[in-house]
Structures are given as structure tokens and as C-alpha cells.
């Protein structure tokens, strides 16, 4: 009996050993089956969606995640938990692996995990399309990117170029147009706003500076975020910030609040250029990219023309205003500020109908979302071309395994602002790390060279484009001063002045018992004169001064002759009653000078149209570097003609010439920046370079305008040297014509 029992026990143990070996081989076979199902490009596991012949014999576990030979075995007793106790010495797993989280140690089973299917839906682990940190070498990631770039280019060619790209072209063009408008808004409203807000010269300078400062911050901020959160989402947010604060700035009354609103408006629009060019380029095949990105640049010009035309049409109409007491005034220049927010608002509405960049989806492991967008591009273009029957044949697309560590905060962890703070810090760290990677050994030389090109181009371009109008105003002032009439030693008694005096100098005059009622004084100076028993009522003045004058028994009623207009003058027994309210500063207001600002800006922006057309047609034929260097050399040569600009018309002509030849270099620089950096760094690098561009613009404007009225040699020398240096640096960059988008 005992011998039979021992035989039976030995038989049971042998059967268990056989069953155990069978299950091990079954698990290996299932893994091999899943490897066949796994997409060659996306490395996603489709075990939940596709059936194989092996599944009937070897059903997969419920969670569907396999890690090589480390598959789970059922416990012999069946009562223990597989997650905690269901393993033996030969087939060891740990609890986290059962939940889909890979082991931390490398080697053995870890090698299978490095090449295996990415994890999906894992809390606290890696997102879909991501590999374990450090599990894939940089060489493998580079190889994956090259494969993705080649496949993505092939897919774009299959999708074709048609209605979808042209629709996106006009949508993104509105966003770029909003950036062009923003640059001109402050300059156009200053002649009118300076009186309403009582702006001193330092206040006006700060207002012009704050716009560039906001755009500099916005370019870096939104450019970095767009590589992490998506092009479309960040562009929508940035345009929303711009439109909201541009709207507020048209209603606020104080200088401080207006300055704050324009700062945040600039921060919002700063993300437009780096995101728009990156976004559009990722829908363009290689043979179309250079040309159509250059066509897109035309909308920046349209923005400048729109701003100049609206300023010309709106600001001089003083009837387009209302006033609520003396505290709230809404003049025509505020209507202009409001109208300038329209391109941004329209861009937001149109952008909501467009999809996210499929290249961004693929870079972040979102295969299905990218496939849907590319199918939309294909179907839209095929229907427009009359081929609705054509089917999008792509089934699998390569995705990049991410190495960034993701952080997920449970809903019961701390307060809501603590969770948001942790997420913000995590996102900020990722953005900063991505920015620093632009200076890695692989990209350091390109980044430093591009910094030099962007800085020199911006320094010379913005410096000269602001210097031109200032020089025109200086020439106007010189011509105006040459027509000044001088009245020496006049004696006037018992006369009533009720008309306008303009551009006059009265020296050594004597005025006895005269009345100045309803008088308008513009650029009038009284020097060494005597006023006795005179009466001033309802007098308005601009650029008017009394120097070394004496007033005896004189009354001033309802005038704007404030104390600072009396220079070294004596007032004896004189009275000021009910001085005019408003700004006590001497401002020029609107007039012929303001019209000239609009006109010059209109011509200057319109003059770049021929250069835009030429650069778009030749960009893919002669290459980016030749276009950039050639345009820079022509711009450098055009600077030497500035020495012949001794009249107003000559300076306007030279401004148009410089703008027309320099725009091609900007178009080439935008295309080159897009193509030199990979998709995961594209908007980050573009945003940083654009921020550097705004810094160089501030320096160029400050330096160039300081020489107005002193010499023209210094601006010519600085601009020529900067352009020559930029063109020489550009020739050392790699040519990107004919290359697929990284």
C-alpha cells in the first residue's frame, strides 16, 4: 500500500514538472507571436486587437504585457496571489512587473524590455511610446529619428500638397499677421497717446522697449512649451493672451496699466513666429517646404500694411471718441488699438478647426493620433483633387521612444496648487533640459553660429528701420527750422491776437495792453520781451517758450502756459486763473508728422513684397545659404547709399530699397532655422533665437537712434559690419536644401 502511495506521489510530481515546462514554452511562444504582431515602426503591442493562430492554444494573460522569459506562472496551489507570491526560483517576477512596470536592473530580462513593446496606461510609469529611461542608447534613438524622418517624408508625399496645406497657410498667416501688427501698434499711437497719458520722453521710450521685452520673453516661453505641450495648443494660448490684453489696453486709462497690458500682449504674440513656422513646416514635403515657408513670411508684411492703413484711416478721426467726465476718455487711437487685435482673434477662431502637428504626436509616441491627422490631410487633398476613392495606405508609423521621466500626482496628494506647482516645476525642468540640449556637442556649433546670424541680422535690420523714420523726422525738423520767421524789436499796443502763430521767433518785443484771446501758438518763441498790462485767455500752445521775458500786471486765464514754459522769466504782479486741465507736458500731438509716420511705414512694409516673391520662387532652386548670404551682401551694399540720403524723399527711397533686399535673408533664415533642428527641439531653438533677435533689436534701436542729428557714418558702419559678419557666419552653416525634416 505504501509503495503504491509513493508511486502515485512520484507520478503527481512528475506531472506537475511536465505541466510547468509546458507553460514555460507556451509563454515563450506567445511572446514570439506578440513580437510578430508588434508594429515595425511604432513598437506598439496590438495583442488586444489582433488574433493569431497561436492564441487559441496559448491564450494571453488579461493585461497583455510580456517581458521576455519573465512571463508569469500560475501557482501550484492556486490560492496565492500572482502579484506577490506567484513565482518560484526558476521564473522569478516582482510585483511591479506584474502591473506593467519594468525592472530597474539591466541585463537578462531587461534586454528584452529595452527592445520590447512600450508600456501603455501605466500609472506612474512611462507613457505610450516611451522606453525605459536609459534602456535605449542615444545611437538607437538617433537611428529611430532617421527612420521616422524618412518615413514621414514618404507619407507627406503620399498625402500630397493641396487644400489642407493652403487652408492651414491662411490660418497660420493670420497668426503671423498679428505679430507684424504688434510691432507697429505702439509707434503709431504714441503721437496721440502721449497727450492723453501725459507721457514724457522716458515714458515713451519705455513703452517702445516693453513691447520688445514682452516678445522676447514670449518667444522663449512659448517656443519651449510647444515642444512639450504641442504646437497648436501653445499657439492658441499665446494668441489668446495677446488678444485679451490688447483688448484691455484699448480701455485702460493710466500709463502703468497700459504699459502692463502691452507687456503681456507682447508676451502672448511672442510665441507666434517660432510656433507658426515649425507648425507649418511639419505639414510640408521637402520639395515644397522652402517655397511655401517663404510665402508664409508675406503675412508679416501684410500685418505691417494693415497696421499702417488702419492708423491712417482711424487715428486722425477725432469724432470717433467719447468722454465720460474728465476721468475717462476714449479717443480714436484707442479704436485703432482695438482694431489691431482683430487678426489675433480671427486666428484663434480659425486655428480651432485645425489639427495638431502629426510630427509632434509621433515624437511623443502618439501613433494613433498622428495617423488620424495624416489620414485627414490625405483625404482632404484627394477629395479636392477629384480622387476621393484613393485610400490612405499607411498602416504603421515609426514613433520615438521617450526617455523623459514623467510625474503623475494623485488627486489626494496635497492641495490643488501644490499639485499644479509640482507639475509646473516638472514641465519647467523638461523645457529647460530641452533648451540645454540645443547646446549639446551635436548641436553646439550650429546653435552658436545661428545665434551670431540672428543677432547681426536683427541688430542691423531693426536698428536701420527705426533709424530711417527718425532721420526723416530730423530732416523735417531741419527744414522746418530753416523756414522760421524772426521778428526783432517789435512794439505792439492795444492789439487783440485771436489767430494762430506758428514757427516764429519774437526777439526784444514790447507788448502794452494787448489781448491774446483764443490764440494758438505752435513752435513760437518770445525772447527778451516785455509784456505789460496784457491779458491771455483760452490760449493753447505746443513747443512754445518765453525766454528771459518780463510780465508786469498780466493775467492768464484758462491757458496751458505752465511754469516750465517760462525760462528765466520774471512775473511781477501777474496772476494765473483756471489753468487748462490735462497733461502739463509739451507734446506735439497728431498732425503732418504723424501722417508721415504712417506713410513711411506703409511704404517700407509694402516694399518687401518683391523680395518676398523672389525669395519664395528661388528658395528651393539656389538654396537657403546662398539666399541668406546673397541677400545680406546686397543689404550691406545698400547701406553705403545712405550717405547720399540728404532729403526726405531720398531717405524714403533708401528705406524701401533696404527692406526689399533684406527680406530674402529673413525668409532664408526662418527656413534654415526650421530645418537645422530636430522636431523635439525645433520650437525651443526657434524661440530662443527669436528672443535673441528681440534683444538685438533693442540694442540696435538704442544705438542707431542715438546718432540721429549727429552723424550718419556710425549707423552705416555698424549696419554694414553686422551684415558682413552675419553673411560670413551663414556660409559656415550646413545647407539644408533637399534634406528631409529631422
Curated annotation (Swiss-Prot):
Residues in the Cytoplasmic compartment per record: 1-169, 227-233, 284-294, 356-447, 620-626, 673-685, 732-742
Ranges for region Disordered: 40-145
UniProt name for this protein: Synaptic vesicle glycoprotein 2A
Positions bearing Phosphothreonine: 84
Any one Gene Ontology cellular component term annotated for this protein: neuron projection
Glycosylation-annotated residues: 498, 548, 573
Domain of life: Eukaryota
Region (Interaction with SYT1): 1-57
Function: Plays a role in the control of regulated secretion in neural and endocrine cells, enhancing selectively low-frequency neurotransmission. Positively regulates vesicle fusion by maintaining the readily releasable pool of secretory vesicles.
SUPFAM superfamilies: MFS general substrate transporter, Pentapeptide repeat-like
Annotated positions of the Phosphotyrosine modification: 480
Residues in compartment: Extracellular: 191-205, 255-262, 316-334, 469-598, 648-651, 709-712
Protein encoded by which gene: Sv2a
Keywords: Cell projection, Cytoplasmic vesicle, Glycoprotein, Membrane, Neurotransmitter transport, Phosphoprotein, Receptor, Synapse, Transmembrane, Transmembrane helix, Transport
Chain positions with Phosphoserine modification: 80-81, 127, 393
Post-translational modification: Phosphorylation by CK1 of the N-terminal cytoplasmic domain regulates interaction with SYT1. N-glycosylated, on at least 3 residues.
Subcellular location: Presynapse; Cytoplasmic vesicle, Secretory vesicle, Synaptic vesicle membrane
Membrane topology: Multi-pass membrane protein
Molecular function as annotated in GO: protein kinase binding; transmembrane transporter activity
UniProt key word Lipid metabolism: no
